[in-house]
Amino acid sequence: MSRLPSSFDVEDADVEELSFADKIVYHCKQQPLVPIGTLLTTGAVILAAQNMRIGNRKKTQFYFRWRVGLQAATLAALVAGSFIYGKDKYDQKKKEDQMKEKAKLREQLWIKELERRDAEAQDRKKKAEAARLKTKENEAAIQKLEQELKELEAKASK
């Protein structure tokens, strides 16, 4: 028996349908270097601010330089990730289109199968109705023959 598609088949959730927190997790998994770079840059800014408040100019300058370097590295990771992810997204889109076409074909096959089964059921109903009519005709003929037999027996016994 062929596998028919089910209304319970669940596909991967679309990115637009995800909640805000789920979107953040999704994008962090797609480009893991960007959040790491962002956290390191934030840490460098916080350390620079602490040293500025203390009055330590050398460490403040050191952490601000690290901030610039980490920000540049984060930006490079973002661009590289976008380039790589862009190719993956194109391939994924192509694959999704193929899956949609396959799903449409599967749905059409499913509809044809249901129509075929419906036609078979209709044929069985017609055959059953014809058999019922034939049975009624035969019963009427049997009753007629029985009646004739009784009449003949009645004549024969007289």
UniProtKB/Swiss-Prot annotation:
Its main location: mitochondrion. Residues 5-96 form the HIG1 domain. Residues 99-158 form a coiled coil. The chain crosses the membrane at residues 32-54, 64-86. The keyword Coiled coil applies. It is a multi-pass membrane protein. Keywords: Coiled coil, Membrane, Mitochondrion, Transmembrane, Transmembrane helix. The keyword Protein biosynthesis does not apply. Associates with the respiratory chain complex III/complex IV supercomplex. This is Respiratory supercomplex factor 1, mitochondrial. It comes from Candida glabrata (strain ATCC 2001 / BCRC 20586 / JCM 3761 / NBRC 0622 / NRRL Y-65 / CBS 138). The lineage of its organism: Eukaryota, Fungi, Dikarya, Ascomycota, Saccharomycotina.
